[in-house]
């Protein structure tokens, strides 16, 4: 797991850097934060015992993130409503996509044929993103965190923060 540093600043001044939070939704959810340069800042997997515990934790997850300008989610749309409620209150754009959206952009057709192959490929690509972002290599990487990393990569490309998939990550 990467260091959980949520405060990112622009080098030229003291304004918060734009950030994008990607979430693989579930009671075991993956989280990945990207900076305005399109690089991964941190990632993690969090487990919540039930929906009530998740709902209570959302404020604590979002509050320390400086410059949060977008939340991109994939997965359980009912759980997405919990995140969206706070995002709407704080006027942070929030979007929910299907897995097929980021998989189509980032994975080869043959890697999309089964969920298991897609998850294995996501793990490999997420590790490449971690390395490209100059973060320490994980000893283990949960599939929800790996998928959040790729959801976020899709998001920063869509936001125009990156022109495309970095060569170090491309398949």
Go through each PLM region and give its residues.
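Phosphate- and other anionic-substrate recognition elements at nucleic-acid/protein interfaces
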Residues: 1-171
